[in-house]
Amino acid sequence: SMKEFLAELAITATPEGMLKLSRGIYEYFDYEAGSTNIRTTAAEAFAKRQGVCQDFAHVFVSLARLAGLPARYVCGLPQGEGTTHAWGEIWYNGCWYGYDPTRNQLVDEGYITLAVGRDYGDCPVERGIFRGAADQLQTVFMQVQEQ
């Protein structure tokens, strides 16, 4: 269970404890595109031990909250080339601290925040509705670099 996972890693409700948690998720999970979808819950992803950045972030946020810290889901862009990315942040001693369990690293100035919320549902890249027969295909590719 998620509680047992926290206990097994001896996680404390501190920035250092959350770094340990982020590393633990990175080591526990397999990155597997297509193994989950936008409706997959943190508990489901945790049980499968696989997912994508969205799932890693959901699990991190859920476990941080379970450890007793306010936490939020973040959608944005990491430095380099690719698509959107997700990570988690905790509120500690008046500051937000970011952790990227997908890449096993702290969030730094190379990350650009697009949206924050309780989970993916609060910050999708796009949102809308169709009326009548419709279909949609979206491809996102970005490049972030220092200038």
Positions of PLM-derived features:
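Secondary-structure boundary elements
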Residues: 1-51, 59, 120, 131-147
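Hydrophobic/aromatic-rich core segments of domains that either
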Residues: 23, 55-134
